[in-house]
Regions:
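Non-catalytic structural scaffold of enzyme domains
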Residues: 1-127
Length: 127
């Protein structure tokens, strides 16, 4: 293809390495995204799911929000330099900025990372 192909997983993993070599994934699936594993390798130290959260709908209530905050703090306490959100649905809720304020470590929004990498690719191709 002549157009750049950019995905949220690879973009977020690449950005995470800018902030440290101990990356934790926070999402709603048992496994970290394949591109997180591929790019981060041994730098991916843990993948976590907030208790009681099975979809982004569960995040909209107080119980889901509290669970996400608790899991983010757990990851920080496990030694994370950075938390990479592994769910684009979390991104649409603006969770990254809020979790970053709570944990005081970088929390990466996969949609923002994807957009940033795409922007760079478009600039590079049009220069």
């Amino acid at each position: 293809l002549t157009i750049p192909i950019v995905g949220a997983g690879e973009s977020t993993a690449l950005m995470a390495l800018r902030y440290g070599n101990k990356v934790c994934s926070l999402g709603i699936t048992k496994e970290a995204p394949e591109n997180y594993k591929k790019v981060l390798k041994e730098c991916l130290i843990e993948n976590a799911i907030p208790d009681g959260v099975h979809s982004t709908v569960d995040l909209q209530g107080e119980k889901g929000w509290n669970s996400v905050c608790e899991k983010a703090m757990y990851l920080k306490n496990r030694g994370a330099d950075v938390i990479a959100l592994a769910c684009t649905g979390m991104a649409t809720m603006g969770i990254a900025t809020k979790l970053e304020a709570i944990t005081e470590i970088p929390v990466l929004d996969p949609v923002m990372c994807e957009g940033l990498v795409m922007y760079m690719e478009l600039l590079r191709r049009n220069c």
